[in-house]
């Protein structure tokens, strides 16, 4: 169990545009404390070592020896080949708007369980995501502290890897649809 306050975060709102007019014009960044960041970095470094073996090859972001541009190049090749052979083609492009905010913690834990992560690992990750509290910095002054209910924090070293695990669930569903002939895959 994490010590109370260890998982506290200040959320700073960084403008995305020159003259922000509404909340969507800001990007929330989590400013986590040093002790939590060290703990999260240790866990993230361990996840980094095994992430390539637990997620599909089609996932390329944040994975050692994989290039994020590979997906774009493969998609381009598939479209070119389909045009040349006059085959019908449907592509799925998933836009993860507010991607980290959308991750449900129980879903993440379920995915990790299905991937056979040890119970202790799942408990550590759950402690890191489920015990977080935050305060928004408004004009440099913090608001009242509140518990975070879902999502992953921008700026947390674990977030990219946990998001990959959550996204792998969608990848597994897409593969199942192909295996059940609901969609036909395109061989590259």
Residue ranges and their predicted role:
Residues 1-188:
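Nucleotidyl polymerases of mobile genetic elements and RNA viruses
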């Amino acid at each position: 169990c994490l010590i109370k306050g260890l998982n506290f975060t200040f959320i700073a709102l960084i403008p995305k545009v020159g003259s922000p007019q509404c909340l969507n014009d800001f990007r929330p960044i989590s400013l986590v404390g040093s002790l939590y960041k060290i703990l999260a970095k240790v866990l993230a470094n361990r996840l980094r070592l095994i992430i390539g073996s637990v997620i599909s090859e089609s996932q390329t972001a944040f994975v050692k020896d994989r290039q994020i541009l590979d997906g774009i190049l493969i998609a381009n090749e598939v479209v070119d080949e389909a045009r040349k052979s006059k085959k019908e083609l449907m592509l799925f492009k998933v836009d993860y708007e507010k991607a980290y905010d959308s991750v449900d913690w129980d879903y993440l834990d379920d995915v990790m369980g299905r991937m056979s992560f040890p119970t202790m690992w799942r408990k550590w990750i759950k402690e890191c995501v489920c015990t977080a509290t935050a305060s928004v910095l408004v004009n440099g002054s913090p608001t009242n502290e509140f518990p975070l209910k879902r999502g992953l924090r921008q700026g947390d070293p674990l977030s990219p890897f946990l998001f990959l695990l959550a996204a792998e669930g969608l990848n597994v569903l897409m593969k199942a649809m192909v295996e059940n002939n609901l969609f036909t895959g395109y061989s590259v």
